[in-house]
């Protein structure tokens, strides 16, 4: 039995889909992400307490 490229691609897609689903269940939903780009600073998933606000209030977009 020989596998074609389409069969291999389909198998890879299935493995990738299962991996993404498993990762979604294993990863905590309380991840704090701070993304600093040239245009903006984005903060998501963080708990905004007094200490956190003091640490991040001076963040600004990266300058080139």
Curated annotation (Swiss-Prot):
Keyword Membrane set for record: yes
Source organism superkingdom: Viruses
Keyword Ubl conjugation on entry: no
Segments crossing the lipid bilayer: 8-28
Subcellular location per the Swiss-Prot or TrEMBL entry: Host endoplasmic reticulum membrane
Lumenal-facing ranges: 1-7
A GO term from the CC aspect: membrane
Family: Belongs to the Tymovirales TGBp3 protein family.
Comment field (misc): TGBp1, TGBp2 and TGBp3 seem to act together for cell-to-cell propagation. TGBp1 is the main movement protein that physically cross the plasmodesma with the viral genome. TGBp2 and TGBp3 would facilitate TGBp1 function.
UniProt signal peptide: none
Function: Plays a role in viral cell-to-cell propagation, by facilitating genome transport to neighboring plant cells through plasmosdesmata. May induce the formation of granular vesicles derived from the Endoplasmic reticulum, which align on actin filaments.
GO biological process, one term: transport of virus in host, cell to cell
UniProt xrefs under InterPro entries: TGBp3
Protein name per its UniProtKB record: Movement protein TGBp3
Keywords: Host endoplasmic reticulum, Host membrane, Membrane, Transmembrane, Transmembrane helix, Transport, Viral movement protein
Chain ranges on the Cytoplasmic side, renumbered to this chain: 29-64
